């Protein structure tokens, strides 16, 4: 379905980007010309583009599951599909609030083992300023010595993969029953 979350018009007045499902069932980005129709796919692969964060010149910024289905990373790619760069680091779930023209954006990173970190970054992904480190909460959680979550995948009889996690007691001993 075409709406503001799946269609983005470019400043040239002639092109737009559509986030749509491929034949294989993955959401990807496609460049269209208003008069000629489809120009080319911008992204492709066995992973999802979950959002188009913005466009800056001839580059698209998008969030995807390329590293892992349980992770979101921000990428930059040229509209011709070349020059893809992952802008996020580590293992986290990234969300982005883009500024005008993607000159700057606010990036929120979260994961199961640490509190959110909120940063301002420039269009190259360079850190400009940390808005929220959550250092006090991070320290308090470390003092509590909470057990870590263990993430894993379970294959089904149909060939699907179910993602799961488990928390074991802090004093867990796998040899003890």
Positions of predicted regions on the chain:
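Beta-propeller domains
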Residues: 1-36
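Short loop/turn segments that connect beta-strands within beta-propeller blades
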Residues: 33-37, 78-82, 123-124
